[in-house]
């Protein structure tokens, strides 16, 4: 088993960055992004078995459904790459069996290595209250799973931290694993980079959970130059249905594909349906400028020119930006 520290370094290497992204996308169930992350990881040199081990380990932190969905996605990715003639490296063989007399003791000692602290039997508090969960943690997670040396302890903690950082409401466990990660050689600089990757793949809010724990400045959720705009549009009646179809497609693509588009919410007046109102919210001015150059917006713009009778753009200022993150949260 490979539990040794690695030499401290300032940055995550490309393979480590891929492990972060794969773990994050798995944890939140974003299979579309996961497919991209898996391809990128293989291209960066992660072996098939390294990725299998990471996805298998993640069931302990984000559940069997997320883990199984990710593994099925990985199988699809490998099949597609094979059909294109891409030969990926299997890597070190995965050892499935773990034949030891006392798995609890094996897991307890592994946990002592990771935490650098004595681990009593049963674990105080939780282990006494729910002995079976204590047994599962020691005998399965820290014995059966961690016994495989396909991933180092440091890589395993990078996987775990990335997953927990992507899930809301698990700050206590994230704190514990960040401490363990540091024991395996993960540095604050690498955790800062990990947080930046989580911000890209999940949100600023989740990335800030890591930054807060390691004492780094939090990134503001709402940018000072956030743009809020109301578009007042009157449509030529004969084009109304065609316009609504194009607008619906453009709004959906913008929200799904552009991280800087917080909302594009089209509406029309009930008594006068040719009067369209669109609430547009952009993270910042750069996001708005980027939006204007996207293919879906350009298609919308050129396709609807003849349909628009009048257009009035009204830039707004929010009275309370701190409540912006609560918009639409109740619609689930």
Give the location of each predicted region.
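Short S/T/G/P-rich N-terminal loop/turn motif that feeds into the first structured element of a domain
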Residues: 221-276, 281-293, 298, 309-332
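Short, solvent-exposed alpha-helical surface patches in well-structured domains
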Residues: 19, 53, 158, 193, ...
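N-terminal targeting signals for Sec/Tat export/insertion, comprising classic cleavable signal peptides
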Residues: 10-32, 233-245
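Short, structured motif recognition centered on aromatic/hydrophobic residues
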Residues: 17-25, 51-55, 155-165, 194-198, ...
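Acidic, glycine/proline-rich low-complexity segments that act as flexible tails and inter-domain linkers
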Residues: 4-16, 27-43, 49-50, 64-153, ...
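Non-heme di-metal
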Residues: 173-174
């Amino acid at each position: 088993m490979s539990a040794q520290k690695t030499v401290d370094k300032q940055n995550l290497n490309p393979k480590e960055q891929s492990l972060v992204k794969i773990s994050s996308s798995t944890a939140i169930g974003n299979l579309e992004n996961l497919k991209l992350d898996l391809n990128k990881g293989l291209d960066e040199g992660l072996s098939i078995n390294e990725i299998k081990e990471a996805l298998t380990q993640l069931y302990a932190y984000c559940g069997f459904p997320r883990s199984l969905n990710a593994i099925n996605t990985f199988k699809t990715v490998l099949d597609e790459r094979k059909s294109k003639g891409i030969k990926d490296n299997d890597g070190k063989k995965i050892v499935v069996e773990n034949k030891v007399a006392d798995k609890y003791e094996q897991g307890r000692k592994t946990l002592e290595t990771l935490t650098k602290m004595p681990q009593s039997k049963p674990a105080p508090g939780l282990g006494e209250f729910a002995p079976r969960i204590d047994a599962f943690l020691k005998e399965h997670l820290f014995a059966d799973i961690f016994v495989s040396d396909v991933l180092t302890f440091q890589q395993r903690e990078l996987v775990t931290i990335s997953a927990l950082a992507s899930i809301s409401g698990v700050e206590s466990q994230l704190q514990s694993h960040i401490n363990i990660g540091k024991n395996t050689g993960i540095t604050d600089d690498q955790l800062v980079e990990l947080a930046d990757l989580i911000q890209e793949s999940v949100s600023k809010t989740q990335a800030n959970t890591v930054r807060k724990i390691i004492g780094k400045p939090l990134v503001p959720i709402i940018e000072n130059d956030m743009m809020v705009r109301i578009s007042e549009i009157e449509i030529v009646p004969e084009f109304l249905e065609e316009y609504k179809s194009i607008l619906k497609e453009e709004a959906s693509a913008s929200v799904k594909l552009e991280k800087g588009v917080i909302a594009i919410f089209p509406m029309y007046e009930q008594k006068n349906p040719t009067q369209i109102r669109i609430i547009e919210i952009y993270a910042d001015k750069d996001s708005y400028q980027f939006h204007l150059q996207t293919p879906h917006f350009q298609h919308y713009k050129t396709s609807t020119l003849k349909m628009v009778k009048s257009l009035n753009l009204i830039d707004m200022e929010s009275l309370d930006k701190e409540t912006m993150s609560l918009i639409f949260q109740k619609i689930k």
